[in-house]
Amino acid sequence: MSNALIEELQWRGLIYQQTDESSIEELLNKEQISLYCGADPTADSLHIGHLLPFMTLRRFQEHGHRPIVLIGGGTGMIGDPSGKSEERILQTEDQVEANVEGISAQMHKLFEFGTDKGAILVNNKDWLSQISLISFLRDYGKHVGVNYMLGKDSIQSRLENGISYTEFTYTILQAIDFGHLNRELNCKLQVGGSDQWGNITSGIELMRRMYGQTEAYGLTIPLVTKSDGKKFGKSESGAVWLDADKTSPYEFYQFWINQSDDDVIKFLKYFTFLDKDEINRLEESKNQEPHLREAQKALAENVTEFIHGKEALDDAIRISKALFSGDLKSLSGKELKEGFKDVPQVELSTETSNIIDVLIETGIATSKRQAREDVNNGAIYINGERQQSVDYELSNEDKIDDEFTIIRRGKKKYFMVNYK
């Protein structure tokens, strides 16, 4: 079974580095193991940049291994320097606690908990907060050489601009985590992003020095990159969150369906549980009939349903179809706000009602002549309905939820008109 797991991870492109490739494969063939991946609660929600390590952990669970999901309630008070060019701003304890609560709830969407072989959720504050300063320095610090720490990329990259002792010690805390989970839960493998290699190997080295433990390994996954060089995980509005209140299921769905042909197959391998035959079929469809965007639809549908559920996916598809067809009447005010979040927002005084004056005041048209031409030519739509009368007066019936009106000029240029 585990040979199949390794083959699947390799086919999906999910293995970047391993501390001991042959020993890891032998271990996975020999027994069902416990393994872990962690996340610090830097916000009250995960974003899609967190997804890949945890989805990889979930793949281990699908093959019979037991995942340990670690929320860094302790390390989150310190701050990981990995991948950061400057010092993190420390959060208050209350902030960290609230973030732990939010992220813990999201983990229940990603993993199966509560069974004999279900995932285990832990918070490293439970043990790190019990270590005294004297114990930290004597029992742990004595086994970690400064030269060894200075050799870590996460430390080296910060030396020129400066790094606090607080963040300098972070790698020791994560090393303590691995040792604790190894002793208490027989955890033998840590999975993380490629930026976590230094922290993972620190844990393995600490266990070797403190306990003579050699059966502890690390596996990292690649940094997710896009073919156009842009950073993965960002939309025009910013980070793409798993929290539906921060990024609506519709926006989430749109993020995935808008992935390019160059990236979509890689992302299907990374972020879905579709099998090899189905992904190969979707790749063939992309190559032969790219206009159908079947691969993008499969990606968006699978990831959205996995994170938000079937009902939210159905709503996202319904909103998308209505916006594409221009059938705005079928959508609620809330859904329209979601759909038009990124279009130009313009303000209109409630005294202005004639359609020509509205187009001028909002800047949709630059002159009365242009406004009249647009209306006469059928280029202006009010809430999805074409308006060709230059004498048309906007009324309260044109105000959605008594707040806004959607005006379209031409085929695709939308504006959200808010009343002041």
From Swiss-Prot:
It comes from Staphylococcus haemolyticus (strain JCSC1435). ATP binds at residue 234. Homodimer. It catalyses: tRNA(Tyr) + L-tyrosine + ATP = L-tyrosyl-tRNA(Tyr) + AMP + diphosphate + H(+). A motif ('KMSKS' region) lies at residues 231-235. The gene is tyrS. One of its GO terms (cellular component) is cytosol. Catalyzes the attachment of tyrosine to tRNA(Tyr) in a two-step reaction: tyrosine is first activated by ATP to form Tyr-AMP and then transferred to the acceptor end of tRNA(Tyr). It comes from the Bacteria. This is Tyrosine--tRNA ligase. Residues 353-420 form the S4 RNA-binding domain. A motif ('HIGH' region) lies at residues 41-50. GO terms for molecular function: ATP binding; RNA binding; tyrosine-tRNA ligase activity. Signal peptide: none annotated. Its EC number is 6.1.1.1. Keywords: Aminoacyl-tRNA synthetase, ATP-binding, Cytoplasm, Ligase, Nucleotide-binding, Protein biosynthesis, RNA-binding. Belongs to the class-I aminoacyl-tRNA synthetase family. TyrS type 1 subfamily. It is an enzyme of class 6 (ligase). It is found in: Cytoplasm. It holds the Pfam family SYY_C-terminal. L-tyrosine binds at residues 36, 170, 174. GO terms for biological process: tyrosyl-tRNA aminoacylation.
